[in-house]
């Protein structure tokens, strides 16, 4: 019997690789009702390196009250086509405006600042 050759994986992904970022995470907290619907609606592609760095700095996004989530979901349904075409920063800003929970907004502000700084770095 011969030994199989193991495939070698890249330890660091190429800078052009994209990963799906759930703006509202972790899934175990955002797994039911309007929370799950909002989590699944707000997924945007981001570079893998940025995605890993963000998750190493911010471990979870707190789940707001169910009434706030329901109100935000109803607003999302009215403007779904427009919101789905938004980039990651615009989508985070939309969530920040429509869900007025203090802890949630703190996490959204952190993500917004993080992505804004990363996009500034790539422009130059």
What are these regions (language model features)?
Residues 2-124:
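Catalytic toxin/effector domains delivered as secreted proteins or via bacterial secretion systems
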């Amino acid at each position: 019997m011969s030994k199989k050759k193991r495939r070698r994986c890249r330890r660091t992904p190429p800078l052009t690789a994209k990963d799906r970022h759930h703006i509202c995470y972790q899934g175990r907290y955002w797994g039911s009702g309007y929370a799950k619907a909002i989590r699944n609606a707000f997924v945007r592609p981001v570079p893998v390196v940025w995605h890993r760095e963000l998750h190493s700095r911010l471990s979870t996004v707190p789940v707001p009250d169910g009434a706030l989530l329901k109100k935000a979901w109803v607003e999302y349904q009215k403007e779904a086509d427009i919101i789905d075409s938004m980039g990651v920063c615009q989508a985070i800003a939309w969530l920040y405006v429509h869900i007025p929970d203090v802890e949630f907004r703190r996490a959204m502000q952190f993500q917004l600042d993080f992505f804004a700084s990363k996009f500034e770095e790539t422009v130059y």
